[in-house]
Amino acid sequence: MAVGIVGWGAYIPRYRIKTREIAEAWGDDALRIRDMYLVEEKAVGYIDEDPVTMAVEASRDALIRAGVKPSEVGAVFAGTESKPYAVKPISSILIDALGLNRQVYSVDMEFACKAGSDAIINLMGLVKANSIKYGIAVGTDSSQGEPGEHLEYTVGTGAVAYVIGSSNLAAEIKYTYPYASDTPDFWRRDSSPYPVHGEGFTGEPAYFKHIIGAAKGLMDELGMKPNDFDYAVFHQPNARFPVRVAQMLGFPLEKVKPGIVVDLIGNTYNASALLGLAKVLEEAKPGAKIIVVTFGSGAGSNAFYIETTDQLPGKVKLARTIGEMLEDKVYIDYSLYLKYRKIIKMIHG
């Protein structure tokens, strides 16, 4: 049974802040910051936007592109690390917001930035087992960075959703490969508002080791090489890391660049690589071969081998594209950024 992507949707907030604006507020060298991360600006959710509202918007567009009725959806899984509620799932809110039946599997998944891709893999299993006809996988985050800390320059906001099924496929997911270990590169304790990163652990032992392990494992099992793929999409904590890991694996820049979005919206965590995939789907031709590798701190990666179908081109314009959302933007200054992020609040009386 062929299983894969029936439809997809995304949501990127309109509000953006230049990394230069943040650097000037803290007295940092804006050019040095830009050269370090290659992130020009990032998306910022408005006061009434959060991972739930973004997940709803992305899922609605995914259903439109899929041509699937809400009543046909048998499961909804949401991957996030920034839930608005400590105890209350996003997935159950999506059931009512999208008009799904009550008889659906629903769960919020957690593994740092790769839970959204875990949601896809779990839905694939349910479809293959004939337990459901279609499922919705969501990656959504409003990423947190402590003011004045370097993470603030790269964390962004956004969501992406994929309808997974076995009919009317825009792209078939032909193979997946996992790679995981106990690596303390990045964490946030329950009582802390902001995460902590393990400095030297964030690069070689975490991001690069796991993405390379998953990508090489997938290619070795399939007997494929970098030149067999038309596109390569990797998790994007900044714009340097995906280009560097591509070079380490042997992928040329022209196969990686189409899927990079972090330079314009920041690292959207669970939506990061999956937004990159959505952008690639907007330009890929039928028969295109795509490798996607997600990454979540702690640490683990999922590698996907995806091949597009003849139905892909007809689905692209059915909903707003990543390209359109990247262009639809309003810039804000740092004071509004702090307000929209609820870092500063008005105290009454």
From Swiss-Prot:
Gene3D superfamilies: 3.40.47.10. This is Hydroxymethylglutaryl-CoA synthase. Its EC number is 2.3.3.10. The lineage of its organism: Archaea, Thermoproteota, Thermoprotei, Thermoproteales, Thermoproteaceae. Pathway: Metabolic intermediate biosynthesis; (R)-mevalonate biosynthesis; (R)-mevalonate from acetyl-CoA: step 2/3. InterPro entries: ACP_syn_III_C (IPR013747), HMG_CoA_Synthase (IPR004656), Thiolase-like (IPR016039), Thiolase_N (IPR020616). GO terms for biological process: farnesyl diphosphate biosynthetic process, mevalonate pathway; isopentenyl diphosphate biosynthetic process, mevalonate pathway. It catalyses: acetoacetyl-CoA + acetyl-CoA + H2O = (3S)-3-hydroxy-3-methylglutaryl-CoA + CoA + H(+). GO terms for molecular function: acetyl-CoA C-acetyltransferase activity; hydroxymethylglutaryl-CoA synthase activity. The active site is at residues 81, 113, 235. It comes from Caldivirga maquilingensis (strain ATCC 700844 / DSM 13496 / JCM 10307 / IC-167). Interacts with acetoacetyl-CoA thiolase that catalyzes the precedent step in the pathway and with a DUF35 protein. The acetoacetyl-CoA thiolase/HMG-CoA synthase complex channels the intermediate via a fused CoA-binding site, which allows for efficient coupling of the endergonic thiolase reaction with the exergonic HMGCS reaction.
